[in-house]
Amino acid sequence: MSHIIELPEMLANQIAAGEVIERPASVVKELVENAIDAGSSQIIIEIEEAGLKKVQITDNGHGIAHDEVELALRRHATSKIKNQADLFRIRTLGFRGEALPSIASVSVLTLLTAVDGASHGTKLVARGGEVEEVIPATSPVGTKVCVEDLFFNTPARLKYMKSQQAELSHIIDIVNRLGLAHPEISFSLISDGKEMTRTAGTGQLRQAIAGIYGLVSAKKMIEIENSDLDFEISGFVSLPELTRANRNYISLFINGRYIKNFLLNRAILDGFGSKLMVGRFPLAVIHIHIDPYLADVNVHPTKQEVRISKEKELMTLVSEAIANSLKEQTLIPDALENLAKSTVRNREKVEQTILPLKENTLYYEKTEPSRPSQTEVADYQVELTDEGQDLTLFAKETLDRLTKPAKLHFAERKPANYDQLDHPELDLASIDKAYDKLEREEASSFPELEFFGQMHGTYLFAQGRDGLYIIDQHAAQERVKYEEYRESIGNVDQSQQQLLVPYIFEFPADDALRLKERMPLLEEVGVFLAEYGENQFILREHPIWMAEEEIESGIYEMCDMLLLTKEVSIKKYRAELAIMMSCKRSIKANHRIDDHSARQLLYQLSQCDNPYNCPHGRPVLVHFTKSDMEKMFRRIQENHTSLRELGKY
């Protein structure tokens, strides 16, 4: 029989290191956060072999007193909290006193430090958690921590390390986040003698963004701010034309601490509405300042998860801050820049094709423009005026179905089929990207456009006061029709339609338990599920606004929505239907329209709340300014913008 014993402190530290120190990036994070808490204004991070051989952090903070240096390597020794009450008003990044002893237990650690006014500094060397020497030493005010041979005594950890490039990438990401969290501090990251990242430490967040993401990206970010009695929000988000393929470029900070929060990420996307393309994400650097009593940071070993009181109010503030800032912007993409991004420039000399002149003179006789046939016009007019039909998709019951014996229909989750659409739709699993986003669109100014031509039956050309505009006719009418349908889908009839064949829905045990608790929320929107066996629910009637062919996917989606967000909305669910209808009933590509219809479409577009994007986030129009034209024909040269000029933006 084994007996209970108290583990030696060194072994306990190694176990704790398993949670706190996962990889070299964890060492960098913990040591740099200590440097920030020490009041540093300059922090230099030097690494060798992606941190596995060496991590050295040098700061100019307060330092550690000589008689406290050894104490700093003991578990739960800290200067940041004194009693239980301090745990609920944490303003520092660290507070547990675990990082330094955990790092020392799995490495060779050398610490050199000095405080202001001391006659000398202190040098400490520890190997595997055991202190080998503590001696006086010469040192500037501040602290230098050198961590060598990481995981030398835990070879199993080394076995699972990724490539040096992958580990270096994690370190760069950590330093970048810290640089964005604290623009008042100068950060420098040096890997194997090469500087990877540097921030100026001027306190200007836009300059920190420029140092990390580049000057071009910094110029395309707009400032946001909002506040109430509990929260103060500030930061920058990118214009919709500057996006990335994942959420990694969204950085959220609470009281200077980088956090990960799904609901706040969703609030950011909600603020953009449908101005973002599906599957694209903005760059965002958002600082949230709150009373420490409203945030619990002591819920995760890495402190990246934070529980926030009044989270819904905070989400609303974030969304409103972004929506209000975007409302003040002209969101028509610059065509010349888009061309530069999408065109593959061939540097080889291209032989010019000689085109014979049709006439001997430069001018030709004016001819009447070709007109579409009566059939084409009729087809187009049907498409233009077809709105409003079949907004409610009721299943028609046939005599054969009425005479069939009753039975149970076991519902299955089936993938949606969007093969017949022009482009991919939002799937129901990501419905929170749909109506919540689309509902927040604000009216904004739209240029006066004078239509003058069409190309390939797809693009309309118009002239404005400040240049040439090219409009995608399908995307334009899709936006117009979507906004017509948007109000209609919210007017929901709560009447019920009996099902001749009830549906059985089955869920995992944990989901079934939570659904039972939240069933009243489903009933509020007309969905009545009754328990039917273990982890199963039966649906005997459906709300009349839900078409019968939508029942399986629709009920599962609404339940998923309820489990994920603790709320359910008919409008969110039906947003997909509005998007599909607007897509199917809009002018298709390669379809010529007459001048009157084109002008009418441009007028309708100008009346939209958001005339810049279709419901999927694709741009409706692009803009060539007069300056763009002059650049294309080399009439003017582009000026270079320096980092110093960022203050003008």
From Swiss-Prot:
Keywords: DNA damage, DNA repair. GO terms for molecular function: ATP binding; ATP hydrolysis activity; ATP-dependent DNA damage sensor activity; mismatched DNA binding. It comes from the Bacteria. GO terms for biological process: mismatch repair. SUPFAM superfamilies: ATPase domain of HSP90 chaperone/DNA topoisomerase II/histidine kinase, DNA mismatch repair protein MutL, Ribosomal protein S5 domain 2-like. GO terms for cellular component: mismatch repair complex. It holds the Pfam family HATPase_c_3. InterPro entries: DNA_mismatch_repair_CS, DNA_mismatch_repair_MutL, DNA_mismatch_S5_2-like, HATPase_C_sf, MutL/Mlh/PMS, MutL/Mlh/Pms-like, MutL_C, MutL_C_dimsub. This protein is involved in the repair of mismatches in DNA. The hex system is nick-directed. Belongs to the DNA mismatch repair MutL/HexB family. PANTHER family: DNA MISMATCH REPAIR PROTEIN MLH, PMS, MUTL, DNA MISMATCH REPAIR PROTEIN MLH1. This is DNA mismatch repair protein HexB. The lineage of its organism: Bacteria, Bacillati, Bacillota, Bacilli, Lactobacillales. The gene is hexB.
